[in-house]
């Protein structure tokens, strides 16, 4: 009686363990695209929107995949000089188009309404307003702002 119970327990243990191992998604480690050949022609820089590098060991070749403005993907050899030049240009353009975190935070504070506003009036000539705004990463408090 004990042997079948132990075997059943062992079976459930192995089954429980294998569910966790086999349930791991393959897509976590697999790239979305693999390149098996490269374009032989230079793509006009004006048609490109972005790029991604393919460096996975699951793909036969390391590659750069350029994404065109029409959302087409084109494989290119990362060792080619024109590919490296295009990557630098796209990186430079990306840096210009994205505002820095400081500017994003400042504009978010200016454009959003305060979360907690307390208004108090002392007199008509000397009004005092207290604002207390809290965001996920920054806390700004302005107290005793006199408005004439």
UniProtKB/Swiss-Prot annotation:
Broad class of the protein's primary localization: secreted
Gene3D superfamilies named in the record: 2.40.50.40
Keywords for the protein's UniProt record, in alphabetical order: Chemotaxis, Cytokine, Disulfide bond, Glycoprotein, Inflammatory response, Pyrrolidone carboxylic acid, Secreted, Signal
GO biological process, one term: positive regulation of leukocyte mediated cytotoxicity
Subcellular location(s) of the protein: Secreted
InterPro entries associated with the record: Chemokine_b/g/d (IPR039809), Chemokine_CC_CS (IPR000827), Chemokine_IL8-like_dom (IPR001811), Interleukin_8-like_sf (IPR036048)
Family: Belongs to the intercrine beta (chemokine CC) family.
Record-linked PANTHER family: C-C MOTIF CHEMOKINE 2, SMALL INDUCIBLE CYTOKINE A
Name assigned to this protein: C-C motif chemokine 2
UniProt organism field: Mus musculus (Mouse)
Lineage of origin: Eukaryota, Metazoa, Chordata, Craniata, Vertebrata
